[in-house]
A protein has these predicted regions:
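Mature N-terminal segment immediately following signal peptide/propeptide cleavage
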Residues: 84-117
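Active-site core of glycosidic bond-cleaving carbohydrate-active enzymes
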Residues: 463-506, 523, 544, 548, ...
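Short amphipathic alpha-helical coiled-coil/interface segments
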Residues: 407, 411, 418, 613-624, ...
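Acidic/polar, glycine-enriched structural segments that form the non-catalytic walls/loops
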Residues: 59-86, 92-97, 185, 190-198, ...
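N-terminal secretory signal peptides and thylakoid transit peptides that target proteins
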Residues: 24-46
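Short, solvent-exposed loop/turn and secondary-structure capping segments
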Residues: 103, 113-117, 123-127, 137, ...
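An extended acidic
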Residues: 114, 119-123, 128-192, 278-330
Length: 796
């Protein structure tokens, strides 16, 4: 609870019987909670009303509401429920809400660069430096910071009086931020400044055009409007420090160099290091040992101004003066060099003369080109067999200047198509908050979670620098990339899952590509994704090439079936352990991929295998009913493995995941409807809580991705008397992966929320999604970074 001032729920807890002589001994684990804990929670909840603009979600609650830790009656506020469905207004943040914002504004698979709430670029993870994250940023969000000097400022002159204002919170008293990925709009106002400034920031994002969506570039498009009654002279400056080899520190013997370049429709300053590598398009086959001996941060970067005018000025160096004033004062110069131990900052200035009420726009670019991505530098043993290296964008462009030149030549189209996607997405009757939340996590592709090697191979961490290998049992929860950039998913199926990763003759798919063995949920997910990619591909040639290995992978799972349409034996899964017995959610995924395999077999004229898969799936649809225990699906635990983790008769979040997947690809039902809906209702009753604090007060193990006072759906609870967290932990595993049961994780919640909506439980599905959304309010943490085991976690 400590430090969590901005509660999403902001409910009041009533203690009308805390000291009554009529109180009986507590009937549940919650009896361990003392009055002080409730008072703390109540106090912080009240603070939520003061410090946070979020509506009250639920309550008031009594102590008795929490007798089962997760209250059965969620007591959702009618106003809050109404807000779930209302179209509402565009989400705009101001004041202190701006401080934690970091929206990805680089190309997909091109590094990670954030746009801050006041328009400053930060984070700058473009230099190929190994950086691990572990989930801790949920509780301790990153503080905006930059390893280099970069920014924008405006100089306004009226009747000879001049003022210089940085385009940050330091320069303007009223700044508003509206982030609708991939576009962000920032407004700058100040009563002492006779102009307003509007910033539109983005990187080209064009679904179905992966290359143009993967440009290593950020667009910053400033529109200045004269709000006074007099003519104003305006100068707009942008500057960029030469940070090439910033981390490898070549010493004073090396010189950084800035060069002004003029091209068709562009004025730019390119930064490099003297005697660096020749500018050339990188060929994958030429990623030699000599190339990999280059410093990882060797390359080029540039700041550019599109459609330059004769009055525009570029200075390769602003000298030693203070920024931003030095950017305006610097004399034009086409070349500058500086020893590596000293800063070298270049600036470009646009001049405008604006009559009263008039406006003008200047479009700046920041581009980069650091080709020497080398995954071996991570020193992870399981990546020893990973041979792919280099940046894909370097196979298209020889330098940052070339990237800027390409964007200058095609800017009208890139801008229009990015806006078209944005406008199409938001041209909806769906709530703004819902459109924001279900699109913004696609920014994971523009984070350091996602990479595209020089060979064209897509490769991802689970979260930034955490758990390698485009893990099958994590990435199969995500669908955005497949729908927006299906060529990347097709390549991932062909090159990795059914290529590098599949073992012959078993058909097992190593769940981390080059490493680790079979994960049954990931295996099923690969087969289902193959069917999805087939649906997203014209003709049947793609499937025809992969079908033998897809069939082999399906047969691998069939061998784990003892004839009843259910999986048995050792079943490693995304909860990082091998489970034994008949597991509802794993067998449900098995049934879904059987249906998908049958459809693919039919398309491949493999009628015998199609019939076999359908017969097994029909059998399994009946067999899985035996795991339905009155309210929800449980597992039949194999008693021969008492040491194994198993949720047993617990209410586990993914129990009907197979049916959720079936909806995604239009398959017939794999789990009966009545039981499926009852299971989802049980998840709402037993796992969704308006305040996770009460549960975590009892079950302390595990990471915190929902704090006291925050709503969420718990991974697994134990409503039955015959099974508990201790049973589920197995013998000797109390401090191990069983702690995952106590956690709240976004990617799992999205899966359930989507499934609820499929099944007609729209209010509950929206409530679960809104809980994720509200946990990521910028008064608390960065809305654009959904954290699990690492930043920008791919499951989301």
């Amino acid at each position: 609870v400590t430090g969590n001032r901005h509660n999403i729920i902001a409910h009041k807890i009533i203690y009308h019987n805390m000291h009554s002589s009529k109180n009986t001994p507590a009937k549940s684990a919650l009896s361990a909670l003392d009055r002080r804990f409730f008072l703390k929670t109540s106090a912080f909840a009240a603070a939520g009303l003061t410090f946070c603009r979020l509506p009250v979600m639920a309550g008031p609650f009594t102590r008795e509401d929490f007798d089962q830790i997760v209250p059965a009656d969620k007591k959702l506020s009618p106003e809050w429920v109404k807000s779930l469905f209302a179209r509402g207004e565009r989400t705009v943040y101001r004041g202190k809400e701006l401080e934690k914002i970091g929206m990805p504004v680089g190309g997909i698979c091109a590094g990670q660069i954030y746009l801050g709430g006041d328009g400053k670029l930060w984070h700058w993870d473009i230099f190929n430096q190994p950086r691990r994250t572990d989930g801790s940023t949920y509780q301790n969000p990153l503080v905006p910071a930059s390893p280099l000097e970069q920014g924008f400022a405006i100089e306004v002159t009226v009747d000879g009086e001049k003022q210089v204002r940085p385009l940050t919170q330091a320069g303007f008293s009223d700044i508003s931020f509206c982030g609708e990925y991939p576009l962000a709009n920032i407004e700058y106002r100040d009563p002492k400044v006779p102009v307003t400034v509007s910033l539109e920031a983005f990187s080209p994002f064009v679904p179905l055009n992966t290359d143009d969506s993967g440009l290593p570039a950020t667009v910053l498009r400033y529109t200045v409007r004269n709000t006074s009654s007099a003519k104003v002279e305006v100068r707009l400056a942008g500057w960029l420090e030469n940070a090439v080899c910033h981390f490898s520190a070549p010493g004073d013997a090396a010189k950084r160099r800035n060069s002004v370049k003029r091209g068709q429709g562009v004025l730019l300053i390119q930064s490099d290091v003297e005697n660096g590598p020749a500018e050339q398009v990188l060929k994958p086959e030429l990623m030699s040992e000599a190339d990999l001996r280059q410093p990882l941060d060797m390359g080029t970067m540039a700041i550019a101004l599109l459609e330059p005018q004769t009055s525009d000025r570029a200075a390769a160096s602003v000298g030693a003066g203070n920024l931003p004033e030095a950017a305006f004062a610097a004399a034009p110069a086409d070349q500058a060099a500086q020893t590596a131990g000293r800063k070298l900052v270049g600036a470009i200035v646009r001049t405008m003369t604006l009559d009263a009420g008039k406006e003008a726009t200047a479009t700046f670019l920041v581009t980069w080109h650091f080709p020497y991505l080398d995954m071996q530098k991570w020193k992870i043993e399981r990546m020893e067999n990973l041979k792919d290296n280099g940046r894909y964008y370097a196979t298209k462009f020889p330098s940052a200047a070339a990237v800027a030149g390409y964007m200058a030549a095609h800017f009208a189209t890139l801008h229009a198509q990015t806006r078209l996607w944005h406008d199409t997405w938001y041209d909806s009757t769906l709530p703004y908050w819902f459109l924001d939340r279900t699109m913004l996590n696609t920014g994971c592709l523009a984070s350091a979670t996602s990479h595209r090697f020089a060979t064209g191979r897509f490769w991802g961490w689970e979260g930034v620098g955490c758990c390698e290998g485009t893990c099958t049992h994590v990435w199969h929860y995500a669908h955005a990339m497949a729908r927006l950039f299906p060529d990347l998913e097709r390549d991932l199926r062909k090159r990795t899952d059914f290529g590098t990763a599949i073992e012959k003759p078993s058909g097992a798919i190593r769940h981390r590509g080059e490493g680790f063995g079979l994960a049954v949920d990931g295996q099923a997910g690969c087969i289902l994704r193959a069917y999805r990619e087939h649906q997203m591909t014209a003709g049947g040639l793609w499937l025809k090439e992969l079908w033998p290995n897809i069939k082999l992978a399906m047969q691998c799972l069939i061998k784990m079936d003892r004839g009843d349409g259910m999986l048995d034996g050792h079943q490693h899964n995304t909860l990082d352990a091998g489970w034994y017995g008949q597991i509802a959610w794993l067998s449900g995924l098995y049934l879904a991929c059987l249906r998908a395999a049958a459809e693919m077999a039919t398309d491949m004229k493999d009628d015998a295998f199609a019939a076999e898969c359908r017969k097994i799936a029909d059998t399994g649809r009946e067999s899985i009913k035996k795991l339905f225990d009155q309210e929800y699906f449980i597992n039949l635990v194999d008693p021969k493995y008492p040491n194994a983790v198993n949720s047993g008769t617990g209410c586990e979040i993914d129990q009907v995941f197979g049916q959720s997947w079936a909806y995604q690809v239009g398959l017939e039902r794999v789990i009966p409807q009545k039981e499926t809906r009852l299971a989802l209702q049980a998840l709402w009753r037993y796992n969704f809580t308006p305040d996770c604090g009460a549960y975590r007060k009892i079950y302390k193990g595990g990471r915190f991705f929902a704090l006291a006072g925050e709503a969420g759906m718990l991974m697994c609870t134990f409503p039955r008397k015959d099974w508990s967290f201790e049973n589920a932990s197995g013998k000797g595993n109390m401090d191990g992966v069983c702690n995952l049961f106590n956690e709240v994780m976004n990617g799992f919640e999205y899966q359930v929320a989507g499934h609820m909506i499929w099944e007609g439980m729209v209010q509950q599905g929206l409530a679960v999604t809104r809980a994720v959304h509200d946990r990521h309010h910028p008064s608390k943490r960065n809305p654009w970074n959904e954290v699990e085991c690492g930043d920008h976690y791919s499951r989301s």
